[in-house]
Amino acid sequence: MQGVIEVRPENLETLSSGGLDLSYIEYGQVQPAIKLLYAGEEYWYFKTLPLKGYGAVLAGYIRDLQARGHKPILARFFNRIYIYATGITPIGAGKPPGAG
């Protein structure tokens, strides 16, 4: 994963899954980012799902994030759906050196 990608509002689409309409960005063959910036907010990487079959579990992850007060946004990189959300602890943050 690379660093940060700034989301341009004109690139946002809507993805409907599991009764939810979700903000979605199609990046195609670009390396995924650890963080997306959109409308002044930081959306940190949360989880990735395979393109085939994501519909079976996506809504559950999104509803859980929303119930905990996080705003999700989805992005497609290569053949995977990446879930990003506001207010989550970034991967590897808060761990002491050498912990894994």
Predicted feature residues:
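Acidic/polar low-complexity segments and flexible, solvent-exposed patches
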Residues: 1-100
